[in-house]
Amino acid sequence: MAAGTPVWSSRFAFIMASVGFAVGLGNIWRFPYVTGENGGGAFVLVYLLFVFAIGVPCVMAELMVGRRGQSSPSKSMAAVAQESGLSRLWGGVGGLGVFTAYTISITYAVVVGWVLWYLVQALMTGFAGYDAAMATSTFEGLLADGSTMLIMTILGNLIVGGIIFAGVTGGIERAVTFMMPLLFALLIGLGIYNMFAGGFGETLSWLFTPDFSKIDGPVLLAAVGQAFFSIGVGMGGMMAYGSYLPANFSITRGAMMIVLADTLVALLAGLVVFPMVFNYGLDMAGGAGLIFQTLPVAFAQMPGGHIFAVLFFVMLSVAGVTSMVGLLEAVTSWTDQKTTLGRELSAVVVVGSVTFCSIASVFSYNVWQDYTLFGMNFNAASEGLYDKITLPLGGLLIALFVGWFMKRDFAFSELATDEQTFGIWQLLLKFVVVPAIAIILITGLI
């Protein structure tokens, strides 16, 4: 390892940190809905095919560059490029990932703040007496209350900042080795509860009964997009975490475990969320509306709903915080190595600046909602920037670099696998991953 580079103390800590980064709120509120709307079990089969054909090679590529470079994403890319006889300007690709992580953090921090606010409400009331109108008015009231949103955003960022400030082993490892097993335990426990609470059979049918008649071009594109966006690549986080890997760690096995765990969380989330929707005849919805408007109505009606609500929002809080840690670790690593601030002060500056920029995101829901650029407010413009441009562009350039330009011997030595496995990985990266991400980028722009 390079002098001064932190090292994960165990494989378990690394896997938990990487899974925590990959598993975000989108796994819980988007994947089940997208699955049901796109053919159920047939979509799951197609998604699993793409997540292993696209997700695993992408994760392997980022981890490999990170470990080879043993530095921040931009410096790792530049170092590996130079080692391969290429221009250090390739480091800009790593810098693009850091920029994407920073941009996502600004709006994501506000959503984590919502989750924390709803956790407080769950603890206080359990959403007793909520109906659809009350749930909607509560969420709309929160969006209109800029002060409360800002306070909760600051609270979430203080938690994330404290973890990053404490360092890789003293902060991130300690947090994720507690929080991620807790997340899995809560998912499994809440899923088991739903097995006996009604609506479970309908959920299994909705999510897993194949309807191959629904598999068409848009559904395939949805599966490709879900496979790419759900695994945390193109944001520098995997590369930063990879830079802390010891030489004897198997990147191939690690990537498989990360993608498997990420997919398992998404599937388990469907078994937690949708039995409540079916059992209480609630409106099917995707995104934030599902979590903050639909489910509180279910919590109000179900036996033990108060406890269920608390555990559910604890689970969401864990998913949100661990994702934010991965995003801001990439930015902190970059800041630490680009400046003379040092690790701790870099963490303070990064988290502080994200919190300041989040003011624009908070106020875009209320007092600044009418201030637009090209017809979009701050949040819409930010999300359009990273969803449609910087995230897929960064993923595409990394895949191009590793698949087509990085010296084969370097990649082979880092992966330390047999020729057949290496050949399959390289084939997928060159001829499946690159075209797939290019399609995501192009369709997002047209």
Task: Report each predicted region and the residues it spans.
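Membrane-interface "cap" regions at the ends of multi-pass membrane proteins
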Residues: 1-29, 58-63, 67-95, 246-250, ...
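Loop-to-transmembrane helix boundary motifs in multi-pass membrane proteins
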Residues: 13-15, 21, 150-151, 261-267, ...
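C-terminal membrane-solvent junction of multi-pass transporters and transport-like membrane proteins
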Residues: 92-100, 340-351, 381-437
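Transmembrane helix-boundary motif of multi-pass solute transporters/channels
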Residues: 13-50, 236-242, 252-256, 260-263, ...
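Helix-loop-helix connectors at the membrane interface of multi-pass transporters/channels
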Residues: 1-2, 112-144, 244-248, 253, ...
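Hydrophobic, membrane-embedded alpha-helices of multi-pass small-molecule transporters
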Residues: 9, 14-26, 101-105, 109, ...
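Membrane-embedded translocation segments of transport machinery
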Residues: 2-4, 8, 173, 177-321, ...
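Inter-helical loop and helix-membrane interface segments of multi-pass membrane transporters/permeases
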Residues: 5, 34-38, 68-96, 109-169, ...
